[in-house]
Amino acid sequence: RAEIVAVIPFYMTTLMRMMAGLLAPDEGSLRVLGLDVTRDAQAVQDRISYMPQRFGLYEDLSVQENLDLYADLHGVPQAVRRERFARLMAMTDLARFTARPAGKLSGGMKQKLGLACTLVRSPELLLLDEPSVGVDPLSRRDLWEILLQLVRDEQLSVVVSTAYMDEAERCAHVHVMNAGQVLANGTPQALAQRAQGLTFVATPPDGMAARMLQARLLDAVSTVVDAVPRGGRVRFIRRPDVDEEA
C-alpha cells in the first residue's frame, strides 16, 4: 500500500538495517514485503532501497556521475535512465547542479542527491533512516514534499525512522517502539488523542528563541518526553506520571 509509515524506535539504525536484510535479528523474526529478512535477505534487497543516515556519496564525482554509478550498481537499463534521471532531477531540484562535485553541495542538497541515488531503480519500498537529521529547515521541508510526491505519483511505500514528532504527524501510520516491542501504534490523530491532557504549548519569554526554549524543556528529562518548536512557540509532552504542577 502506497503510504508513509513512521517508526519512532530506540536503536533506530539497528531496526532499519534488519529491515534492509543487512543484519539478522538476535531472536524472533522479521518480515518485509512478506519475506523473511533472514532467510530471504537477497530477495528483500532486490525489491527495496535503503538510505542510511550516512549515505555513501562519492564526493569527488559529480551529481550526474553519482547517479550513473548507482544506476550501474543496481543494473538499471540504459533505456530507462534518461527519463528516470530527468524525473529525479526535477523532483530534487538538482538539474542545475549535474556537473558539480557532490562534495561541493550543501548538506540539504547532498541529502537530496542521496535520495535520488537511492531511487534510481524504482523500488517497491523505500527505507529511510532519520533522513532529515542535520538538514536545514527548508531542505527538510523540501525532502518531505518529495516523499509525499513519490507516494502520490509512483505509489511508493515508505518507512521512515524519525525522532521528530512533526515529521511523524505527516505519516499515515506511526509505530513507537522500544527494545523490539511496539509500545503504541496508530494514525497520528489516534496517538495524539491518547496524549490528550499531556500536551502543552509554551511561549518563549521576550528575547528567547523557540529553539532555546525547546532545548531547556528537553533538558528536563524527568518531566518532559518531547518538545517541538511550532510557529514561534514550543509544543511539549509531559510524562504521564508527573503532576501538572511540576
Q: Where do the model's predicted regions map?
A:
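Conserved ABC ATPase "signature" region
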Residues: 68, 72, 79-97
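Conserved catalytic motifs of ABC-family nucleotide-binding domains
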Residues: 122
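Catalytic Walker B motif of ABC-type/P-loop ATPase nucleotide-binding domains
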Residues: 126-129
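Conserved ABC transporter NBD signature motif
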Residues: 28-39, 43-44
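Helix-to-loop junction immediately C-terminal to a conserved catalytic motif
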Residues: 20
